[in-house]
Amino acid sequence: LAGQAVELPAKTSAFRDWAERLRAFAGDGGLDGELAYWQGQLQGASSDLPCLDPLGDQSNRHARSVSCGLDAEATRQLLQEAPAAYRTQVNDLLLTALARVICRWTGQVDALIQLEGHGREELFAEIDLTRTVGWFTSLFPLRLTPAEGIAASIKGIKEQLRAVPNKGIGFGALRYLGSAASQAALAGLPVPRITFNYLGQFDGSFAMEEGALFVPAGERAGDDQSPDAPLANWLALNGRIYGGELRIDWSFSGERFEIASIQRLADAYRDELLALIAHCRVAEGQGLTPSDFPLARLDQARLDQLPLAPCEVEDLYPLSPMQQGMLFHSLYQQEAGDYINQLRVDVDGLHPESFRAAWQAALDEHDVLRSGFLWQGAFETPLQVVRKRVEVPFSVLDWRGREDLAAALDELAAGEGRLGFDLSEAPLLRLVLVRTDEERYHLIYTN
């Protein structure tokens, strides 16, 4: 369009190369380690749904659709506010609401859902799919088990979603490309009757005010499949955000479900999603889950005993061997002060507030400067705790004209050293800036 020569980047892997590599990988047992996981998702699961006629015709000619959605403000809250409470993604909340509504509808304790993934997983170092044209979508089942309360439901389903290996691509590969034993093991298990797919935000792709070349057409596109072709599933949910509003379309066969029944279900889903958003926006609606800190290897029970508010915690991870030794000696030989370091310097022409702001910026940037330790109670294995935000301990004293200045500075520094640190409280440093003359300051930095 600009009249310039087209320069294309290097070609990425072909769809055929990917397909052949995946077939060989699955056939050679490369995904057999996932088989037990997928069997666990399906064995004993119920796929029954309340319907008009379980044998009703599933062809496209009987396709019906209802929808539900959120207005712009509720959608903004879903995208920008609600995820912070439990460190979730939008999909976590959408599926939590769906699982709770489906379980109430069916009377079951869990909901068997088929999910879609983009399928472009990085399984092979020699395969690059970043610019490869093709339909790689992977389908996989997940048995979601909501709890009675909203908080426990969000945490539990978030963890179930994080536990899916390789983002679900292994199920289809094992079911259709794996060994004969793997295919047989999965073939006779229940099949999800509900498919859920959240397509994401389309506002950025079709931003008319930014001069997008293509925008959605207002007219109907016509049928994209034969009327005799089967529908994708008993219930197929497709969600997207466009024009700042979330919309979920529910597709089904009118021979199998009543339109009014599915519309009530869709409305119940919208109400449940609004309840989840409202819960996440209040202070008590907050929590951490084990997948937030994989290196810490904590279960939910111990994580719930953290002596910090969830919103204060940036990260948790084990101590290095050297840190473990230093912590041990610091705790059992507290009077020795072997690991207390101190730096004292005289500085001319310093601006105290700018100096404090520079230190605060350093703490904001570097995790290690916002770190403390946990070792008591449920945390028999010490952990390093990185806080999201800490204020730099910074004090300024004006001792201009003091006759005993040298001795007073020595005593002040010694007192700072004797004071030590509470190793559970970050940051493990203090700065004292003493003004000793009009343009001179004495800095005592203790850590």
PLM region descriptions:
Residues 2-4, 9-64, 292-334, 356-407, ...:
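Short amphipathic alpha-helices and their capping loops
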Residues 1, 109-116, 147-154, 171-172, ...:
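Extended, hydrophobic beta-loop-alpha segments that form or line the acyl/peptidyl-thioester binding
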Residues 238-242, 374-376, 434-436:
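Short beta-strand micro-motifs enriched in acidic
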Residues 11-35, 81-95, 99, 104-224, ...:
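His-Asp-centered acyl/peptidyl-transfer active-site segments
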Residues 70, 144-146, 250-254, 345-349, ...:
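Short beta-strand-to-loop capping motifs
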Residues 435-444:
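Conserved catalytic micro-motifs used in adenylation/nucleotidyl-transfer and phosphoryl/amide-
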Residues 72-88, 252, 361:
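Surface-exposed, Lys/Arg-rich phosphate-binding patches that contact polyanionic backbones
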